[in-house]
């Protein structure tokens, strides 16, 4: 899978731009504030319906306009597909895939699997469990079609259950919701567990390349004791949940744990090593996606020279090339990337004041 054409309108400081990306590495360079990261953000927005830089989508629309427009041509297994998105300042979103209107953003995400490696993505190991659940669920969503609906149902039931707890509802009235919660939680947990097990197999060789002589163990915690029946646990914890007004255990508390020996990786590894570990995790996800559903991710790598030294830049870029994925990588100076590549990028773009120029 790859983008063969990308059109951006009134997105951040880009009034209008059209790119014809190539396979493999696409280098985008320019000074800070030029708009190079906005190109990556636009691709992400097209695939996810939101930004990786701001939770307020209206902020990416140019002040002089009331909407942004993004569309792209995709090459998917030698077949062309078209996707388009329009976001209005009012919050309304219009999405089309091959000319047909799409109501759910999950359909958009399924069409364009995107991996992001930015300075902020390294927070995966430092933030709370939510970001690591999202990491697992990206893969679970793309690799198993039954995951999304099951997880949507879990979140819907949890919302209802928590409201009943806040209303001090008796357990006999909550039991119906608990049966449904257990049913969907088992589906979600089974898919997550199988996905993490498969991811572990992919990770072994990749971590060895990035962190030789470091033995990183990855394990999945489901959000409650695996030896305890979830239905019994919900009943047992009802008094505590009633007091707090929230469901204390379940798949919404799941986490991905990474350790070196008995220590969390945050305590055992240097900051530089942790960055390499996150890169390894992202590459493993891309390789697993290709293995399981024969679809490549699109990688967005922002400000790579600022995050890794020359040796590890070269290693990361080569690993990305080996995945067969299309990659968009930004830098202030092109030499920082060009010097790390054995062969030139398939396309090079220069960005200045929101204007994009192809470098032949």
Curated annotation (Swiss-Prot):
Q: Which PANTHER family match?
A: DNA REPLICATION AND REPAIR PROTEIN RECF
Give the family from UniProt: Belongs to the RecF family.
Check the record and name the PROSITE patterns matching this protein. RECF_1 (PS00617), RECF_2 (PS00618)
- Write the gene name: recF
Arranged from A to Z, the UniProt key words for this protein are: ATP-binding, Cytoplasm, DNA damage, DNA repair, DNA replication, DNA-binding, Nucleotide-binding, SOS response
Q: Does the keyword Ribonucleoprotein apply?
A: no
- The portions of this protein that span the membrane are none
Q: What is this protein called?
A: DNA replication and repair protein RecF
Q: Could you tell me which species this protein originates from?
A: Shewanella sediminis (strain HAW-EB3)
What is the protein's known function? The RecF protein is involved in DNA metabolism; it is required for DNA replication and normal SOS inducibility. RecF binds preferentially to single-stranded, linear DNA. It also seems to bind ATP.
What does UniProt give as GO cellular component?
cytoplasm
Q: Which NCBIfam families match?
A: recf
Its BP terms in the Gene Ontology are: DNA replication; DNA synthesis involved in DNA repair; double-strand break repair; SOS response
Compartment list: Cytoplasm
Is the Cytoplasm keyword given for this protein? Answer: yes
| Lineage, top ranks | Bacteria, Pseudomonadati, Pseudomonadota, Gammaproteobacteria, Alteromonadales
Any Pfam family hit = SMC_N
